[in-house]
Amino acid sequence: MNRILGGLCLVLISYSAMAEHHGSEDADLHAAIKTFDHAYATNDVETYFGYYADDATVYFYGARQDVDAYHEEWTAMMEAGGGVEKNEMSDLQVQLMPCGDVAIATSFIDNRTRSPDGTISTARAFETDVWQKIDGEWKIISLHYSDIPSEE
């Protein structure tokens, strides 16, 4: 009986240590998500693109996009006077995988963007980001952004 109780205590201690480890991973991940979203909302191009893994895949506007081309387009839009005026995330759901180094974050996005000619566009969308801890840093390995049609 003592062996069983001792084994049970060892298992429970292991789970406790894993929970503490995942707690710090979860805090780091939430900080990365918040910083990534804030960088986009404030037109901080380099911080925003710094969160993408080198081989990340992104999908928006109905097609897979090249991250380098996306970076160039966004930089050019900022230099020409365009930019994001609003990018609010809501209903954030984060699922940290048991391994602790992969997570899926989903949220609704309310966006308002100004083109260089001053035209304002608004969108409501659903975004899914797949994050992976690479060399100790959380990076986006895949992002899928889908517009939600407005109800008129």
Q: Where is each model-derived feature located?
A:
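Beta-strand elements of well-folded, non-transmembrane domains
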Residues: N111-S115, W131
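Sec-dependent signal peptide recognition
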Residues: N2-L10
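Short beta-strand edge/turn micro-motifs at domain boundaries
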Residues: R124-E151
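N-terminal signal peptide c-region/cleavage motif recognized by signal peptidases
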Residues: S14-S16
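Short helix-adjacent coil turns
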Residues: F36, N43-D44
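Short beta-strand segments enriched in hydrophobic/aromatic residues
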Residues: Y52, I109-N111, H144-D147
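A solvent-exposed, acidic/Ser-Thr-rich amphipathic alpha-helical stretch
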Residues: G23-A32, V45-D101, F108, T122
